[in-house]
Amino acid sequence: MRENEGPKGEGREAMSEADPVDLIGQATRWWSTAIIDMRPGVIRFRGYPVEQLIGAVSFPQMIWLMLRGELPSADQAALLEAALVAAVDHGPQAPSIAIGRMAVTCGLPLNGAMASAINVLDDVHGGAGEQCMDLYAEIAGRLDRGAPLDQATAEGLDAYTAKHGKIVPGFGHRFHPVDPRSPRLLALVDAAQARGAVAGRFAAIGRAVEAELSRRKGRGIPMNIDGATAVIYAELGFAPPLGRGLFILSRSVGILAHAWEQTGQGGRIKGPMPRGIPYAYTGPAERAHSPDEEGPRAGPTTGETP
């Protein structure tokens, strides 16, 4: 029996008896979208003819339109652009960048190198912005229920770490005592708040988290790029999963640049370290093999038919 076909070819008979107009309607609804209207000679994004957008809107404005359905205000577009610019690259020590470069030396073209690099931007490397937005939302929910900011922050941190572990995303940095990107991004948020473009609620939450973490640790735990972009994306009303998507979109620029640079530099099969620097071997020392030596006997494989 073929897929989607009932006994005695019922699926085929039902399809043959269906109203052709209804079948066409089903086909056109198969991939329904409110994003683009594309027909011969016509391309409209969210209702706007593409020829009116070309040369009139910036790429960040276009990103906003595609994701949110409307064009942003000038302040909203400027904040989005600032966050995207800030996160484009962090050097070849970032695994995603290194993977993109290594992929080129293994013979992959740019699309393959970029795909290889983007695929590692997951929860541990690439997900901190989304996770930080979740933390901010946890605290914001407590504010909505009437808790003061310091209490909401402390309780929100406790709830988040109880669920996700002790690492708090968006704060502290293994390279930078103070991430140089964060103060500038927060200053832009403050300026936008002064103009009434954003509420400043999540900037206050982010700063409260920074203060509470520093109090608990007894030393400064400054906000990093993920915490700062999480402030911006939350202030702009993006859902947390889009925080990760926007980070990946931004970091893709750096991945492309490094992959292209490596293409020009050449090199074949470059690994994580130069050939002259050995890795650490932790296995047994050299030992001789005796022909009479027997290894451990293998037991029966679970589920194997005798």
List each model region and its residues.
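Non-transmembrane, aqueous-exposed alpha-helical and coiled segments at domain scale
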Residues: R2, E10-P306
